[in-house]
């Protein structure tokens, strides 16, 4: 099994190194091949997604990704910025389903900004459609307004759109995920205002006829954002579009106490996927050895579970992470009084020891 390792920028190389350390500690061997991406890709080839990196990603069985982005690239034209690498990988690999778990570990309940009784036992899975919606809809751009009260003035415009096949395939992924959990699926939209959202809801209802054992409900996105802060444990699996999912998954991540704990998976139709921590490249702490590697280590566990069909090995890593937290090890972002505060490498070593 071949894994493409794309560390990226900022803290990416540090945290990916710890995930690789954990993979190498398992009792089976994987072929790991590394390549530059993001700002590192731009420095190496003049493009954030070099041709050789894309070829490796296509050839591999799965991709372990760190993070991309750095302030020093903000002046580049949009097509050359590091963040375009992840968008390019999603497009070229046809990764359309993003899984973002939001789990509050018992040992970290006090780190959440919400009261312990609201988040104790929290375990949400957000399934976000990645390839459509207003992020990719055409036409888009800046022009002279052709009509309206400010006709002739400069305006920016984007297009929100979804095709039926796009909605159906993410619906099936979400229903199947819900079927493996509590058999409850919440679809989030804005169908009281947006035609695209009403269409989304209609297709979700139609697909639900194939999953009689799963309870489908609906919620407007503004209410969902409020309910995530008010009573988050009411949710189990949430499915939504690209933009709403982008926002809600970041909100849900902070319920857990630290975005440094949260993995994610982006999958294609055949469960080949790209696995990355939910956080960014954090250039302000890069090279200091203090970044939390647990989200990346847990992303490696998701990689084993979904793309390589190694559920037992994934379980081992997840149990090791829980054991390390139980032993009191903490990086700075999740530190509590009386804990054993450690750096990036020491946390990775602790997980390996727990294995």
From Swiss-Prot:
Keywords attached to this entry: Amino-acid biosynthesis, Branched-chain amino acid biosynthesis, Cytoplasm, Leucine biosynthesis, Magnesium, Manganese, Metal-binding, NAD, Oxidoreductase
SUPFAM superfamilies: Isocitrate/Isopropylmalate dehydrogenase-like (SSF53659)
Enzyme class: oxidoreductase
Any Pfam family: Iso_dh
Protein's pathway: Amino-acid biosynthesis; L-leucine biosynthesis; L-leucine from 3-methyl-2-oxobutanoate: step 3/4
Catalytic activity: (2R,3S)-3-isopropylmalate + NAD(+) = 4-methyl-2-oxopentanoate + CO2 + NADH
Entry GO CC: cytosol
Chief localization: cytoplasm
One Gene Ontology molecular-function label: 3-isopropylmalate dehydrogenase activity
Cofactor annotation: Mg(2+); Mn(2+)
Keyword Oxidoreductase part of the UniProt annotation: yes
UniProt-annotated location(s): Cytoplasm
N-terminal signal peptide: none
Chain sites annotated for binding substrate: 90, 100, 128, 222
Ranges in coiled-coil conformation: none
Binding annotation for Mg(2+): 222, 246, 250
InterPro entries xrefs: IsoCit/isopropylmalate_DH_CS, IsoPropMal-DH-like_dom, Isopropylmalate_DH
Binding site for NAD(+): 280-292
Biological role: Catalyzes the oxidation of 3-carboxy-2-hydroxy-4-methylpentanoate (3-isopropylmalate) to 3-carboxy-4-methyl-2-oxopentanoate. The product decarboxylates to 4-methyl-2 oxopentanoate.
UniProt family annotation: Belongs to the isocitrate and isopropylmalate dehydrogenases family. LeuB type 1 subfamily.
Protein name (Swiss-Prot/TrEMBL): 3-isopropylmalate dehydrogenase
Gene symbol of the encoding locus: leuB
